[in-house]
From Swiss-Prot:
GO terms for cellular component: cytosolic small ribosomal subunit. Keywords: Ribonucleoprotein, Ribosomal protein. SUPFAM superfamilies: Ribosomal protein S5 domain 2-like (SSF54211). The gene is rpsI. HAMAP family: Ribosomal_uS9_B. One of its GO terms (molecular function) is RNA binding. Residues 111-130 have a biased composition (Basic residues). InterPro entries: Ribosomal_Su5_D2-typ_SF, Ribosomal_uS9, Ribosomal_uS9_bac/plastid, Ribosomal_uS9_CS, Ribsml_uS5_D2-typ_fold_subgr. Pfam families: Ribosomal_S9 (PF00380). This is Small ribosomal subunit protein uS9. Gene3D superfamilies: 3.30.230.10. GO terms for biological process: translation.
């Protein structure tokens, strides 16, 4: 018999995370590596587990993640978004608690583009009076 698996795609900044939830002991694997060796900060790991804390399902699922693009923070938040969507697929009754926690909303903030005549998006060249 085929194993039950729930999928979710999460995005944040330039990161895209494809998440698979499989019933298990709570192991999280990111790009073939354990989450603790992949992400350098404990705060990012807590960020990822937030969806499980809200739905009280910590330790019920193994998480398999393939994530690309962006930096550590963007990737961690993309994973969190993907886990939230996969949990919603697993049990639609989680929608209320996940929505209240703001975990189903895609954060729209992106890097502002560089403008011509400026050094960065808003940083202007140094002004010289003389």
């Amino acid at each position: 018999m085929a194993q039950v698996e729930y999928r979710g795609t999460g995005r944040r900044k330039n990161s895209v995370a494809r998440v698979r939830l499989v019933p298990g002991e709570g192991n999280i694997t990111v790009n073939g590596r354990d989450v603790r060796s992949y992400l350098p900060f404990e705060s990012l790991i807590l960020d990822i587990n937030q969806a499980f804390d809200v739905t009280e399902t910590k330790g019920n699922y193994d998480v398999l993640v393939n994530v690309q693009g962006g930096g550590f923070t963007g990737q961690a938040q993309a994973i969190r978004h993907g886990i939230s969507r996969a949990l919603l697929e697993a049990d639609p009754e989680y929608r209320g608690s996940l929505k209240r926690a703001g975990l189903l909303t895609r954060d729209p903030r992106m890097k502002e583009r560089k403008k011509p005549g400026l050094k960065k998006a808003r940083r202007s060249p140094q002004f010289s009076k003389r």
